[in-house]
From Swiss-Prot:
This polymerase possesses two enzymatic activities: DNA synthesis (polymerase) and an exonucleolytic activity that degrades single-stranded DNA in the 3'- to 5'-direction. DNA polymerase I, DNA ligase and the flap endonuclease may be constitutively associated with the PCNA heterotrimer forming a scanning complex able to couple DNA synthesis and Okazaki fragment maturation. Interacts with PCNA subunit PCNA2 and weakly with PCNA3. This is DNA polymerase 1. It comes from the Archaea. It catalyses: DNA(n) + a 2'-deoxyribonucleoside 5'-triphosphate = DNA(n+1) + diphosphate. One of its GO terms (biological process) is DNA-templated DNA replication. InterPro entries: DNA-dir_DNA_pol_B, DNA-dir_DNA_pol_B_CS, DNA-dir_DNA_pol_B_exonuc, DNA-dir_DNA_pol_B_multi_dom, DNA/RNA_pol_sf, DNA_pol_palm_dom_sf, DNA_pol_type-B, RNaseH-like_sf. Belongs to the DNA polymerase type-B family. The lineage of its organism: Archaea, Thermoproteota, Thermoprotei, Sulfolobales, Sulfolobaceae. Keywords: DNA replication, DNA-binding, DNA-directed DNA polymerase, Exonuclease, Hydrolase, Nuclease, Nucleotidyltransferase, Transferase.
Length: 882
């Protein structure tokens, strides 16, 4: 796994320990000639056995789709190749004879045949004919789709297309019958059906039937899957050099394996250039090898005992490095259970490979499944946030560690990687399986893609189930591009949410009312979908009005829209069924934990729905739908604020889907909640209650303290991960002071103490009292250094300064830099001195953070500056409030 750059990642002035000693320990691969034939890494699935479908791939050598099936009894993955004759294809709106006259198509080596198919128009529900062009190779679809005026369903990966046509749902159980998969979903009892009918009583028939069809997805057992986490350490001759996984020029000195079955093993290369060391290894089994060739052979043998391999950044580093290193040592490709032919993906041929880095990097997973608990995406940061543990700290290059320290360091990384899937009763693995079921994506693709791909795949699957034609993006835009409002935010095509400006000050006894999943609820309630808004023929039109009463669009209520149905389905399942089941005392603890996982999985999809459908890059993006959602949101919020004020409630602040009320009477709260339900059929609920909230007067910017002393910080810069540590430390002092406020009588004294803390920080900054680590900004490199052409951000400028010293930085490395008085204005911490620090730039960091809090106390930054006699540092005008 690649390592985060630290203060130690700079070449030493003394000669590095000789690489020669390590290289001399490597023996060449056996010289006898080997005859290697293609190996089938997976056994074939057996007739009449039940398996869980985990992944569908395309085997290019056999020219078939292959289903990867997990047997929970043997804990192995088996292969089932398609025997239906299914082939890649795409659709065109041309007569078959016209297609037959296109030479590039019919003379293509992969062309198979043409047939006529019947599809349903999602806008009218009428049937019509299309021509299906069938080929023998998925790559031919990509090639031939450009030879027709319009190619439908030609941008879908073949293995996903296969799942749509066969109706497969990854993560679900199937039995093999005559070489085909037949579902063995659990049967519903009368109690289940009655619960569904009750929960979806106000829904249309399509939604009720879908609810019955979907219930097994959430209720079917999630199998425990044996898995092993691996991590490799590679010898490097100088500090700061990150090994290139494609060149694989340096030896692998150790490989750690941590298994869900209790395996704790490290394979170590014997070397004569390091000491043995004396570290307590806590039951870790160590195997030593004289040659790297033998070490890798043993590693492959162990790997084959597991159906799933876990890594953290294994797509980019661990697995490619192992593969190319094995080739260098004399292994044939057929002997290596790894394939790196795919773009940005490494496959484990004897099972599945899950790169947890990519899964945890998914913003929807971070924000909704794990409630934003981590802000950085490296292994150490994620582990600290979710597990409360961290990597082993070392103060020298990995290559120079004593053997036992290397073992401890290496194994901890593998152990943490495994624990990220086992904590909270296998929470992560259960989420992955449930996400796979909901999205209809195979586990490997799901863990490597963003939420937009998940949602797109679900909708495509549902289109195919209904035999609906999946429309082209340009066709949707042609029918739904009429935008009536102007965006207030640059880059947005239409007006967004309404925000009620907050006053500056500290207010006690604040209750927050929240519209439960407002945008998804609006989509469901108003039947919003690309095929229902602004369509030409409609018997039951409904006007979409904004907060001013202007009619923006017309929604057709003749038929349920697919977006409204699926969004409403997931929302109602979560709110009406699974949130309740997760808290039901009649359920066992194990059941409650499972139901909590189910509702978390639903939350990810529900909360991501509007963001995905409101993104111009999404293939089903309809501007009129996105504009309708935000317009109705503004209408609902402004109407509710008006009603609340009529009830005598004081609305201090409102943002998108929530209202902050000052000390509201209980009966008034109940009245407004009932009114919203009656008027809009939306759920308004008490979300939280604060002891007090400090508003800066800015939108999306406040500091709230709950009755139990916990805090809720929104919009303040200190929450950003690149905020220097010294600012965070000062902020924590201020935070503790804020928490101590219990009544309005405390405010004056706490204000004085906060001002003193901020002044003290300035004095320490002025006197060079902070070290470089405390002053460092931390920013992740998102792409190779050479890819920054037009603009060069500060962290890139700092990274470029490391090049002359032999330090190679790669995408996803964290760059630590400080602001200095120089042409570039920055330096990497490895090259900087405290005396070079530009104090004025750090004063700006202090100001931007604490000016917001001070505003709530009625203190402007100018007052702070004046009392410290530092006006000369601030040539720009004050932005603070008096």
């Amino acid at each position: 796994m690649t390592k985060q750059l630290t203060l130690f990642d700079i070449p030493s002035s003394k000669p590095a320990k000789s690489e020669q000693n390590t290289q001399q320990s490597q023996q060449s691969a056996p010289v006898e000639e080997k005859k290697v034939v293609r190996r089938e890494w997976l056994e074939e699935a057996q007739e009449n056995k039940i398996y869980f479908l985990l992944q569908v791939d395309y085997d290019g050598k056999k020219g078939k789709a292959v289903c990867k099936l997990f047997d929970k009894e043997t804990q192995k993955i088996y292969a089932l190749y398609d025997n239906t004759g299914h082939k890649p294809y795409f659709l065109v709106d041309l007569e078959p004879d016209k297609v037959g006259k296109i030479p590039k198509i019919v003379r293509d080596p992969s062309f198979d045949h043409i047939e006529t198919v019947s599809k349903i128009d999602p806008y009218t529900w009428n049937k019509f004919k299309l021509t299906k062009i069938v080929v023998r190779d998925p790559l031919a679809v990509r090639r031939l789709r450009n030879d027709v005026p319009k190619a439908y369903e030609a941008h879908i990966k073949y293995f996903n297309n296969y799942m749509y046509d066969i109706g497969l749902i990854p993560g679900m159980p199937y039995v093999v019958k005559n070489g085909k998969l037949e579902s063995v979903y659990l049967s519903l009892d009368e109690k289940d059906v009655e619960e569904i009918k009750k929960a979806f009583a106000d829904s249309d028939e399509m939604t009720r039937q879908m609810a019955v069809d979907w219930l097994p997805i959430f209720e079917t057992e999630i199998p425990k899957i044996k898995r092993v986490a691996i991590d490799i350490e590679v010898y490097t001759p100088v500090k700061g050099r990150i090994p290139d996984s494609q060149k694989a020029e340096f030896p692998i000195i150790s490989i750690a394996l941590a298994g869900s079955d209790g395996l704790k093993k490290v394979l170590v290369l014997n070397r004569n250039d390091v000491n043995e060391g004396s570290v307590k290894l806590d039951g870790i089994s160590v195997e030593r090898f004289n040659t790297e060739y033998e070490l890798l052979g043993r590693f492959f043998d162990i790997l084959l005992e597991y159906p799933i391999v876990l890594t953290f950044n294994g797509d980019d580093f661990d697995l490619p490095y192992i593969y190319f290193r094995a080739l260098k040592l004399g292994y044939f490709p057929e002997e290596i259970p790894i394939d790196v032919a795919g773009k940005d993906e490494a496959k484990y041929l004897a099972g599945l490979h899950i790169d947890l880095y990519k899964f945890f990097f998914n913003k929807a997973v971070r924000n909704y499944a794990f409630e934003g608990k981590y802000n950085e995406y490296n292994l150490d940061a994620v582990a600290k946030a979710l597990l409360g543990t961290s990597k082993v700290k070392v103060d020298t290059l990995i290559s120079f560690l004593d053997v036992e320290k290397l073992i401890e360091y290496n194994f901890r990384d593998a152990e943490i990687t495994l624990q990220l899937t086992t904590f909270n009763n296998d929470l992560t693995m259960k989420l992955i399986v449930l996400f796979s079921r909901i999205s209809r994506l195979g586990i490997e693709e799901l863990t490597r893609t963003e939420i937009s791909t998940w949602v797109k795949n679900l909708y495509y699957w549902e289109h195919r189930k209904r035999n609906w034609l999946i429309p082209l993006k340009e066709e949707i835009l042609a029918k739904s591009s009429n935008i009536r409002t102007s965006a207030l935010i640059k880059g947005k095509g239409y007006k967004g949410a309404v925000v009620i400006d907050p006053p500056a000050g500290i207010f006690f006894n604040i209750t927050v009312l929240d519209f439960a999943s407002l945008y998804p609820s609006i989509i469901r309630t108003w039947n919003l979908s690309y095929e229902t808004v602004d369509i030409q023929q409609c018997k039951k039109p409904y006007e979409v009005k904004d907060e001013t009463g202007e009619v923006l669009h017309i929604v057709c209520m003749d038929r349920p829209g697919i977006t409204a149905v699926i969004t409403g389905l997931l929302r109602d399942f979560r709110v009406k069924i699974y949130k309740k089941k997760a808290k039901n005392p009649n359920n066992s603890e194990e059941q409650k934990l499972l139901y909590d996982v189910v509702q978390r999985a639903m939350k990810v999809f529900i909360n991501a729905t509007y963001g995905v459908f409101g993104a111009e890059t999404f293939p089903l993006y309809a501007p009129a739908v996105a504009e309708s959602v935000t317009a109705l949101g503004r209408y609902v919020i402004t109407s509710t604020v008006k009603k609340a004020r009529e009830e005598g409630l004081t609305v201090l602040y409102g943002d998108t889907d929530s209202l902050f009320l000052l000390n509201p009477p209980k009966n008034s709260l109940e009245n407004i909640i009932k009114w919203v339900k009656t008027t809009f059929n939306l759920d308004l609920e008490v979300d939280k209650t604060y002891k007090f909230v400090a508003f800066s007067g800015l939108k999306k910017n406040y500091f709230g303290v709950y009755q139990d002393g916990k805090v809720d910080i929104k919009g303040m810069l200190v929450k950003k991960r690149n905020t220097p540590e010294f600012v965070k430390k000062v902020f924590n002092e201020v935070k503790e002071l804020m928490i101590s406020i219990n009544s309005p009588n405390d405010v004056k004294e706490i204000k004085r103490k906060i001002v003193d803390v901020v002044k003290g920080s300035y004095e320490k900054l002025k006197n060079k009292g902070y070290n470089l680590d405390e002053l460092a900004f931390k920013v992740m490199l998102s792409k190779p250094l050479d890819a920054y052409k037009k603009n060069t951000p500060q962290h890139v400028k700092a990274a470029l300064q490391l090049r002359p010293f032999g330090v190679n930085v790669l995408p996803r490395d964290i760059i630590y830099y400080v602001k200095v008085r120089s042409k570039d204005g920055v330096k990497p911490v490895q090259l900087a001195k405290v005396t070079e620090i530009d104090a004025e730039k750090y004063l700006e960091a202090l100001r931007s953070t604490f000016e917001q809090i001070l505003r709530a106390f009625g203190v402007s930054w100018d007052e702070i500056a004046a009392t410290m006699s530092i006006d000369s540092f601030f040539s720009y005008p004050s932005k603070g409030n008096s």
